[in-house]
């Protein structure tokens, strides 16, 4: 793009008032618009999307805020099946209704003809033909602005701009998927030279209190679990806001850095919720910006210093790599000259432990520059969180500042492993053997499984499956059933015989780095932000959840090289959606709805099998967190503690409160799904009523609206029996018509011997009576009828000796399970 003859990169924001729930008289006023626009300009945003409100457009003209605008959604007179049939009538409507109101305003720089219309098959062809024809006519009317034909999905085939909507790192994939944008030819139409924009991305729709907004019957609840998992509710808000800012930072800075490789990358406009408060505010100051809003101020600095660092966890005394990038989008169009970078690795008190200065060459306007760094961490550095900080100075003035987080493990990080059971290993490659030797863990090697004792622990090293002797699985299963423990470190499970296991394990195949759209699979084989389902498990001793987000790369990757960094903690996860979880302890999981399993232990006979998807031994000597997890895994496996598929409970379980659930319900596997409840602002309660649909989803007025009504927040409120169900690749729940009659779900717990009663609190949020059946193990079910709009606590006597209970719910999917207590 060019503005006044000079190239310009578009630093945008896509979700803005008006029509977002703010009191109409306020949000349409010139004063409010000016305060809002000035705040965004202060955060270095230079383009926004707004509807056709003249006060807002006048303010954008006055404040120098560019606008991209037009028709969002279907054009007028279109239907869900086809575009408008009268082309010239549609063109006139564009001129008068959709684009015309913006035309007199110099701030308007891009026209949009439609948003996310069909793009494949015959419907897609029809839409492409219509939009191409409309564009051809409209440029006769105004050829001074470029056009987006089908925003998000059209990929530039019907107008001027190659526009994309991708929610990598929210609905699907991860922020690493942005690395695909370095391949310019993959993002162009043959024979065309087009500017590339992302006019929607990032997502991460946080609500009023910072937690993700779990809008019913949408993709939001599943995405929440992918990124903040089963953190306690009181920590969900902080974690969601932090990840939202992380995602915005990486999307915007990578997009700008990648111009070195793909000069057609021209603008990015995250579609995310930047403010806490909307409904009922009296002025702009009451909106309260979120951390993501302030992140714009850093990542959208006209002259950007940006850190590229793929080694997040470092051991004291080691050397790690990073790359410093500079992107010069100076608002005055000036070259960057006579400048230098001062950088430092700072501790929590902002005291540098390492620092240096890097002189900068002349960097022309709209140019980029980078240099690698090798940073040596002093050996006496204590364990903790550290910050890489860089500052560009020009003639003594600060031009740009940016930071990057680094975790350093000090001398006291590692703890010795003291096995109480003999450790045997099968390790053809030798990496695991070396790890054990370096950590003084006693072991013996074997290539035969005939002579194993029931006290032994048998570890199969990473990627060794193809080298196992014949009939190994039969021998390993027999060994486990006698009381042995098998530890299977990560394998290419799609190439592995899994039939010998006592439960069904389904391999995953596609990487989250794959940019195919729509996503071909729901759960990828690799992932970040791993969720420790059993947070008190010995395997996670000394490893907080944030240390399971990303691990250090071991391939010496940087963005000048093809491919992707090896930073996913899990690279070979698997599915347990058809497994009986009374036999399996899910220790860690990941992905949307936590459907992917990273680590589990399967009971069989008197012993067990541990399946692992973590990428561990490749990081020996590189990532102290991966090393600690592997040490903990070996320490647990060679100890006396047994798996706990039946979670021991001696407290009241508040369903939907993850700290109370303590990993009893693991996500996609038990059939008990979170029940989101909308909290409606006081000024909207007369207009928006809570509706319950036939599948039990509760919503305020209508489905969705997480972006148009950000002041309505959906929060966890119990769980509902929802199986059988599946997910679409896009991320929505899918229930077949043949399965709609009733839902099912279960949980497995072990209770104290003194308990003789089970108290279950159930809610019926509907206008009519509903039925639900409660069962325990193989004992007869008990039927309950819940009156309309009632909350009832029902009592079930435990007049049997079993202390390990599989509790099942069967019946109306609209039933809400609120609490369970054993007394």
Give residue ranges: language-model regions.
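Short beta-strands within extracellular/lumenal beta-sheet-rich domains
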Residues: 720-757, 792
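Helical hinge/lid and interdomain linker segments adjacent to catalytic or ligand-binding clefts
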Residues: 418-509, 599-600, 606, 612-621
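Beta-strand-rich binding/interaction modules
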Residues: 319-360, 369-373, 384-393, 770-776
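N-terminal carbohydrate-binding accessory modules
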Residues: 1-41, 58, 406-416
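A glycine-rich, often tryptophan-bearing local segment used as a flexible ligand/cofactor-contacting loop or short
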Residues: 465-560, 625, 629-631
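Catalytic beta-strand/loop cores that center a nucleophilic Ser/Cys/Thr
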Residues: 517-624, 641-647, 652-666
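Substrate-binding/catalytic cleft of secreted carbohydrate-active enzymes
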Residues: 31-286
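Aromatic-rich peripheral "rim/lid" segments of glycoside hydrolase catalytic domains that contact
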Residues: 270-327, 339, 659-661
């Amino acid at each position: 793009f060019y503005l006044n003859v000079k190239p310009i990169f578009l630093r945008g924001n896509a979700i803005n008032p008006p029509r977002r729930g703010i009191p109409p008289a306020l949000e349409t006023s010139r004063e409010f618009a000016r305060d809002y626009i000035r705040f965004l300009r202060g955060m270095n945003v230079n383009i926004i999307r707004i509807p056709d409100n003249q006060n807002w457009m006048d303010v954008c003209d006055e404040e120098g805020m560019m606008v991209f605008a037009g028709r969002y959604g279907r054009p007028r007179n279109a239907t869900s099946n086809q575009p408008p049939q009268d082309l010239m009538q549609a063109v006139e409507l564009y001129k008068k209704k959709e684009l015309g109101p913006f035309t007199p305003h110099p701030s308007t720089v891009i026209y949009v003809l439609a948003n996310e219309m069909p793009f494949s098959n015959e419907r897609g062809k029809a839409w492409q033909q219509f939009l191409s024809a409309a564009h051809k006519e409209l440029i006769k009317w105004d050829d001074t602005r470029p056009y987006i034909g089908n925003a998000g999905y059209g990929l530039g085939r019907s107008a001027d701009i190659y526009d994309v909507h991708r929610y990598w790192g929210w609905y699907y994939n991860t922020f690493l998927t942005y690395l695909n944008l370095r391949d310019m030819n993959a993002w162009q139409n043959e024979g065309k030279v087009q500017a590339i924009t992302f006019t929607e991305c990032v997502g991460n729709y946080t609500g009023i209190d910072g937690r993700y907004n779990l809008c019913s019957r949408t993709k939001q609840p599943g995405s929440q679990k992918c990124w903040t998992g089963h953190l306690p509710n009181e920590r969900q808000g902080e974690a969601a806001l932090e990840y939202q800012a992380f995602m915005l930072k990486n999307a915007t800075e990578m997009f700008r850095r990648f111009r070195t490789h793909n000069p057609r990358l021209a603008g990015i406009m995250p579609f995310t919720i930047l403010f806490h408060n909307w409904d009922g505010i009296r002025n702009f100051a009451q909106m309260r910006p979120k951390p993501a809003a302030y992140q714009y101020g850093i990542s959208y600095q006209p002259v950007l210093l940006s850190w590229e660092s793929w080694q997040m966890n470092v051991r004291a005394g080691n050397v790690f790599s990073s790359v410093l990038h500079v992107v010069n989008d100076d608002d005055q169009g000036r070259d960057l000259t006579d400048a230098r970078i001062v950088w430092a690795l700072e501790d929590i008190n902002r005291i540098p432990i390492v620092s240096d200065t890097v002189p900068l060459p002349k960097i022309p306007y709209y140019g980029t520059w980078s240099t690698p760094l090798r940073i040596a961490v002093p050996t006496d550095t204590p364990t903790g969180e550290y910050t890489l900080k860089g500052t560009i100075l020009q003639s003594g003035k600060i031009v740009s500042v940016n930071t990057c987080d680094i975790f350093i493990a000090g001398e006291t990080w590692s703890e010795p492993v003291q096995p109480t059971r003999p450790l045997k290993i099968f390790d053809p490659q030798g990496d695991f053997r070396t790890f054990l030797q370096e950590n003084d863990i006693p072991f013996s090697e074997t290539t035969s499984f005939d002579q194993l004792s029931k006290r032994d622990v048998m570890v199969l090293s990473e990627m060794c499956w193809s080298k196992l002797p014949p009939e190994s699985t039969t021998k390993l299963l027999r060994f486990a059933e006698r009381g042995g423990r098998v530890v299977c470190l990560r394998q290419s499970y799609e190439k592995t015989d899994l039939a010998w296991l006592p439960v069904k394990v389904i391999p995953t195949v596609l990487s989250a780095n794959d940019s195919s759209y729509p996503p071909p699979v729901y759960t990828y084989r690799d992932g970040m932000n791993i969720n420790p389902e059993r947070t008190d498990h010995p395997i996670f001793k000394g490893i907080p959840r944030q240390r399971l987000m990303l691990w250090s790369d071991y391939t010496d990757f940087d963005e000048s090289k093809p491919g992707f960094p090896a930073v996913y903690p899990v690279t070979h996860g698997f599915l347990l959606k058809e497994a009986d979880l009374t036999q399996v302890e899910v220790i860690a999981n990941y992905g949307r709805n936590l459907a992917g399993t990273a680590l589990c232990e399967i009971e069989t006979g008197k012993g067990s099998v541990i399946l692992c998807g973590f990428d561990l031994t490749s990081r020996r000597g590189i990532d102290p967190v991966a090393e600690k997890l592997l040490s903990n895994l070996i320490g647990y496996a060679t100890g006396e503690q047994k798996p706990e598929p039946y979670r021991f409970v001696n407290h009241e379980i508040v369903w939907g409160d993850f700290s109370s659930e303590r990993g009893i319900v693991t996500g996609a596997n038990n059939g008990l799904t979170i029940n989101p409840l909308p909290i409606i602002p006081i000024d909207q309660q007369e207009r928006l009523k809570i509706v319950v649909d036939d599948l039990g989803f509760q919503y305020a007025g209508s489905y969705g609206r997480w972006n148009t009504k950000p002041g309505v927040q959906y929060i966890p409120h119990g769980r509902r029996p929802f199986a059988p169900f599946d997910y679409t690749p896009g991320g929505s729940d899918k229930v077949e018509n043949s399965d709609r009659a009733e839902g099912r779900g279960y949980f497995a717990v072990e209770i104290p011997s003194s308990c003789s009663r089970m108290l279950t609190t159930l809610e019926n949020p509907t206008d009519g009576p509903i039925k639900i059946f409660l069962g325990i193990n193989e004992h007869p079910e008990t039927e309950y009828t819940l009156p309309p709009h009632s909350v009832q606590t029902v009592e079930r006597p435990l007049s049997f000796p079993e202390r390990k209970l599989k509790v099942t719910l069967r019946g109306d999917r609209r039933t809400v399970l609120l609490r369970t207590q054993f007394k």
